[in-house]
Amino acid sequence: MSLTVDSGQTLQRCLALDIGGTKIASAIVKNGEIQQRKQISTPQDDAAQAMHQTLARLLKEYEGQFDYVAVASTGIINQGILTALNPKNLGGLAQFPLKDSIAQHTDKPIGLLNDVQAAAYAEYQLQNPNDVQNFTFITVSTGVGGGLILNHRLLTEPNGIAGHIGHTLADPNGPICGCGRRGCVEAIASGRAIEAVSSQWDDPCDPKEVFARFRQNDEKATALVTRSAQAIANLIADLKIGLDMQKVVVGGSVGLAEGYLSLVQSLLSELPVVYHCELESAQFGQDAGLIGAAYWVKDCLLQAKNTGVVYG
């Protein structure tokens, strides 16, 4: 991402947008506090044209109330364009020119990043920077995603793809992932992966019921949840040994399910000590993307004041 900023510009008020597959949240973020929060459904029919109209309407509604725009979005933000490892996840929004669409309606600085990267940056604000330089946020939900912070810096990188750790290899003989590769972590650990198995049982159920049965020590449910947790524990071990990760925070509907993180911790503790890593549950809720995007874009803009351009 590249940004330009006037050295005299104030950056107190952010218009933050969080674009998901089913909803778009918007708010003014000032000093880390959410104000004027709104939520609408993500356009599904004639999605691209409807998204242009939705963004125009939101920018009009908040006109005059913000100094910059920060966007957290599902998928990958590549040079301001919305894409994904599995374009089917975006429906009619694949290759949507997100930054240009917003720029048509404001002359304020605009920054964009993946929603899990944004959530990672929000969670990192709660850490002591003297103790934690290398940090990962993992969301285990419908899919598996991540945000990586190394030496205090959030990794987004030129193509916006950094942090897609759900698409690292867990089992070369595992199921085909939505990205087209066989055996990704997401294809084994995610809520979608859990349901792919539990829906085929003689007594089929959804992931919520799987976890209810897991807490009742049901054998099949316990084996399925353990399979998911083992993939996440191995992923964390790889992050620790590969990047000297100091802390991992886990969120998402699966990641925050009762008993899940403690199981991941137990499985991780069975590995040699060099693979151990401090684990915590995510603290931010549904507004992590809004808050994280606002913090990150502001930090990028402040960094730019000396040079006029920053690359995030």
Residue ranges of model-derived segments:
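Active-site glycine-centered loops adjacent to acidic/histidine catalytic or metal-binding residues
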Residues: 18, 115, 141
